[in-house]
A protein has these predicted regions:
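Extreme N-terminal leader/targeting segments of oxidoreductases
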Residues: 1-14, 32-33, 495-497, 501-502, ...
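N-terminal glycine-rich phosphate/pyrophosphate-binding loop and immediately adjacent elements
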Residues: 7-162, 487
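Mid-domain catalytic core of redox enzymes
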Residues: 10, 259-261, 287-415
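A conserved FAD-binding loop/helix module that cradles the flavin
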Residues: 65, 519-540
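Conserved FAD/dinucleotide-binding core of flavoprotein oxidoreductases
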Residues: 113-122, 265, 321-326, 356-358, ...
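Flavin-binding catalytic cores
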Residues: 128, 360-361, 393-397, 437-476
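Active-site/ligand-binding neighborhood in enzyme catalytic cores
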Residues: 145-278, 285, 480-495
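A glycine-rich dinucleotide-binding beta-alpha-beta segment and adjacent secondary-structure elements
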Residues: 206, 211-227, 378, 396-405, ...
């Protein structure tokens, strides 16, 4: 917003605003490309929302996301994160769909049933034919997701240009879809805009399987299973699982779901170490007041202390609304662009609950060797849809859908000896809760614990301490507008070449010298690092 002159002579080729994981990835690649880079992080530690924090004496937990789902092994290897301290637990991370009164269903990351009702025997129906149909359609969904994988990795093309890079990206995407063959291509076109409720009811018999896949389709979004476009978000998640495997030196190979030792903060620390080793500098506890603009070009930043740091290029890891409307200012943008940014849907709908436990909880029908996996409370599609219905009216459900991990099962160092941590992502927790969060925070936390108690009798008696992070808390603590972990809703109209808005969908912005690299860019949230890498490539002038 400032147009003042440089104050103290500090100058870099690139300044990255925000030391979240995407900002750190961006800084590492820029430094490797020969640029002088400074990362400015307002918090006292790097990582943004990908940090490990102590929430009770001796108990540490990943503050937001608690598993790596879509970070590619190729990127982990390319940045040599293993050499910078990143390691993963040995546990083969599976998804376990819990049942309150029966046997749970165990799934692989791409939806393949590997145990429980629907595994081997029959998609919940007790027939070999049912199992065959179940596996056949899952294979189809994964083929469709694999065809969409290049969309996740690449820079979205611009429409209406003759630039070879844009034309090549469109041709590559068209070729990937064409390679599916007539049947699969027709199916992709048929189901792409459907709701996941109808798709799963048409093709699977097991309520647990339907519920688990439906939950994955809407996790972290403002959608329910019956919402149009929720098949697309399921394919998006499956595409991340397809894209994730690769040879890595710091853990097991080819696993889409990974639990880092030390929590997600270990990923951020390794990224910071890699960036510094490449030549980047990082300053924590340093908040940016505004982006300096001179001659209609980003020329640096002004800190809240008044210090001005000049740069040829400014890359913002901050969410798009905060970048354009607060740090830059609408006076440097045309009215149409400003309106599109203002209308971005950015209100979060997921909460995070942390429990410090005096013992390991036992879940109904679950053997102890399965407790180190990802556990889901989403017993049916109707259950998830009913939870979503309340959120539309600014309310929370008495029966929320929940993703649970017990990170201390695989990483005992996160809690005192013999104690455990439970980390839960809860759908749905409206940002604009009717009558506000302050008076209802305890009630919501109690509902979540009571819901888990139905699947893990005795859980409540083992709770030593509780921490709830509702969307307004995420907004305040991690400076994310609306507390949305994707920085902006992930939906058809806010994806790919429309993300965050036309005119800024290729990481470049309407202001020369200003780029975006955060989760509000393509391909969205989750600890992937793709947006940071692609933004760096754009700055360096390399083809993604």
């Amino acid at each position: 917003m400032s147009s003042g002159a440089s104050a103290n002579g500090l100058r870099y080729d690139c300044v990255v605003i925000g030391g979240g994981h995407n900002g750190l990835v961006c800084a590492a690649y820029l430094a490797r490309g020969g640029r002088s880079v400074l990362v400015l992080e307002a918090a006292e530690e790097v990582g943004g929302a990908a940090v490990t924090r102590e929430f009770a004496p001796g108990f540490r937990v990943s503050a937001c996301a608690h598993l790596l789902h879509s970070m590619s092994g190729a990127m982990i290897e390319d940045l040599r994160l293993g050499d910078h301290g990143l390691a993963f637990v040995d546990q083969e991370m599976l998804t376990v769909a819990l049942s309150a009164d029966g046997e749970p269903l165990v799934l692989g990351a791409t939806g393949r049933a590997v145990g429980g009702p629907g595994a081997g025997g029959a998609a919940g129906a007790g027939s070999a034919g049912g199992a065959s149909a179940h596996m056949g359609y899952l294979h189809l969904l994964n083929r469709l997701a694999a065809a969409l994988r290049p969309m996740l990795d690449g820079v979205p093309p611009r429409l209406g240009t003759n630039a070879w890079g844009d034309r090549r990206a469109l041709l590559q995407l068209a070729w990937q879809i064409r390679r599916l063959g007539r049947h699969d291509m027709r199916e992709l076109l048929r189901i792409g805009g459907m709701n996941v409720y109808d798709l799963l009811h048409d093709n699977f018999d097991s309520p647990l399987l339907r519920g688990a896949l439906g939950f994955d389709a809407v996790l972290g979004t403002n959608l329910g299973p019956r919402s149009p476009g929720s098949v697309f978000t399921l394919l998006y998640r499956l595409a991340g699982a397809v894209a994730a495997p690769g040879k890595v030196e710091c853990g097991r190979l080819g696993r889409p779901l990974l639990q880092p030792r030390g929590g997600l903060g270990a990923v951020s620390r390794a990224l910071a170490s890699a960036a510094v080793a490449a030549g980047a500098k990082i300053r924590t506890g340093t908040a940016v007041e505004c982006i300096v603009v001179r001659a209609h070009r980003a020329a640096g930043v002004q800190l809240t202390s008044g210090e001005i740091i000049s740069a040829d290029t400014v890359i913002s890891n901050v969410d798009p609304k905060a970048t354009f409307l607060r740090l830059l200012g609408a006076e440097y943008l045309d009215a149409g662009f400003t309106r599109r940014v203002s209308n971005l849907r950015t209100r979060g709908l997921a909460a995070k609950l942390h429990l410090a436990l005096d013992r390991l909880p036992l879940f109904t029908g679950l053997t102890e060797d399965l407790l180190g996996n990802r556990l889901l409370i989403a017993p049916s599609l109707d259950y998830v849809e009913r939870a979503f219905n309340h959120s539309k009216y600014g309310e929370f459900s008495a029966a929320p859908a929940i993703e649970i991990t017990l990170p201390t099962v695989n990483d005992a160092a996160l809690a005192p000896a013999g104690r455990h941590v439970l980390s839960a992502v809860v759908q749905y927790a409206p940002y604009n809760l009717k009558n506000g969060w302050e008076g209802q925070r305890r009630e919501f936390a109690d509902i979540v614990v009571d819901t888990m108690e139905r699947y893990a009798p005795g859980l409540r008696k083992s709770v030593i301490a509780t921490q709830l992070l509702a969307p307004p808390d995420l907004e305040r603590e991690f400076r994310i507008t609306g507390g949305h972990w994707h920085h902006a809703e992930l939906a058809f109209d806010q994806f790919f070449m429309m993300r965050p808005v036309p005119g800024a969908a290729q990481y470049q912005t309407p202001v020369d010298g200003l780029y975006l690299c955060g989760a509000g860019c393509h391909p969205g949230g989750g600890v992937m690092g793709i947006a940071g890498r692609n933004a760096a490539r754009q700055v360096l002038g390399q083809a993604a």
